[in-house]
């Protein structure tokens, strides 16, 4: 199914009654998802749309997630917005290159705190929500780790677990964005959204710690230290 090709919707949605919706990183315009949401509204049998949103987005109209949540609710679809903090996988994914090659973390948030969450924990919670659709209709869950840490602490944990000195570069936002585009070759639209999210973090938009994960899953979310231990190979050459 292609978001920009409504002709692909009917076959993909045949016999579907529950939907997990995630905005592709390269689609910064929320209107790109509107045709699919309209198609879901016409299905008449959708029990739940679980949208992977963003922590704090209900109070922040700037990220595209805010408008997408509104589209879903305005369509009258039964929804469960999953609003996670920053994925731990950001450190083992898009930012792993600098750690592998230069032992540096290039993220422009100064000393701001982040309540990292493992994507695996998000996946488990989302699966439960979809399986228990009627128990989670018209709800929202803010999903975070059990603690908020800054990137100096991230660097310290990486150093301790990987056995080498990792430092936090603490770049300016303009430098980081130019680096991602010019040196890393990342897509401009992707870097625009990433820069916007880190600007939110810079102004304390990612430090909130919640207990929603534990309330739904009846266990604690994975710690960042355990995540590093489980994924140490991600930062090795």
Regions from the PLM with identified roles:
Residues 5-9, 175:
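Short acidic active-site motifs
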Residues 174-237:
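A hydrophobic C-terminal alpha-helical subdomain
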Residues 14, 25-34, 38-48, 54-167, ...:
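Oxidoreductase cofactor-interface core, primarily capturing Rossmann-like NAD(P)-dependent enzymes
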Residues 9-12, 231:
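Localized chelating/binding microdomains
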């Amino acid at each position: 199914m292609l978001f920009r090709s409504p002709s692909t919707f009917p076959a993909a949605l045949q016999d579907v009654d529950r939907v997990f919706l995630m905005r592709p990183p390269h689609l910064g315009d929320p209107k790109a998802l509107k045709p699919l949401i309209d198609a879901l509204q016409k299905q008449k049998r959708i029990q739940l749309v679980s949208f992977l949103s963003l922590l704090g987005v209900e109070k922040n109209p700037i990220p595209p997630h805010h408008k997408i949540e509104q589209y879903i609710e305005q369509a009258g679809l039964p929804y469960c917005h999953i609003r996670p903090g920053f994925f731990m996988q950001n450190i083992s994914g898009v930012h792993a290159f600098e750690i592998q090659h230069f032992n540096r973390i290039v993220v422009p948030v100064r000393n701001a705190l982040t309540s990292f969450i493992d994507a695996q924990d998000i996946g488990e919670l989302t699966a439960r929500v979809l399986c228990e659709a009627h128990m989670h209709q018209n709800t929202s869950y803010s999903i975070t780790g059990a603690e908020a840490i800054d990137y100096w602490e991230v660097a310290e944990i990486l150093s301790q677990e990987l056995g080498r000195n990792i430092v936090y570069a603490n770049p300016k936002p303009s430098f980081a964005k130019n680096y991602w585009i010019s040196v890393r070759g990342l897509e401009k639209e992707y870097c625009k959204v990433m820069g916007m999210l880190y600007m939110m973090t810079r102004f304390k938009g990612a430090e909130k710690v919640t207990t929603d994960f534990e309330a739904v899953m009846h266990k604690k979310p994975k710690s960042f230290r355990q995540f590093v231990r489980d994924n140490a190979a991600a930062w090795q050459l």
